[in-house]
């Protein structure tokens, strides 16, 4: 059974201010959710893994999901 994880952290790009983020992913383990985050940020923002600092990874209940797309997947 897949779980939902909320990952918070800081992403920094050269010459720009750091960006704080909070993302939610559906995965089996926290490591899988982290790998999805690295893959997404690398492709979308061209950020290397070493420039992403993870502050917290927590498992959340389906009621606590804030991402509208993930919420539809969970409640369907």
Swiss-Prot record:
The gene is rpl18a. It comes from Methanocaldococcus jannaschii (strain ATCC 43067 / DSM 2661 / JAL-1 / JCM 10045 / NBRC 100440). This is Large ribosomal subunit protein eL20. GO terms for cellular component: ribonucleoprotein complex; ribosome. Keywords: Ribonucleoprotein, Ribosomal protein, RNA-binding, rRNA-binding. The keyword rRNA-binding applies. GO terms for biological process: translation. The keyword RNA-binding applies. The lineage of its organism: Archaea, Methanobacteriati, Methanobacteriota, Methanomada group, Methanococci. It comes from the Archaea. Signal peptide: none annotated. Part of the 50S ribosomal subunit. Binds 23S rRNA. Transmembrane segments: none annotated. GO terms for molecular function: large ribosomal subunit rRNA binding; structural constituent of ribosome. Belongs to the eukaryotic ribosomal protein eL20 family.
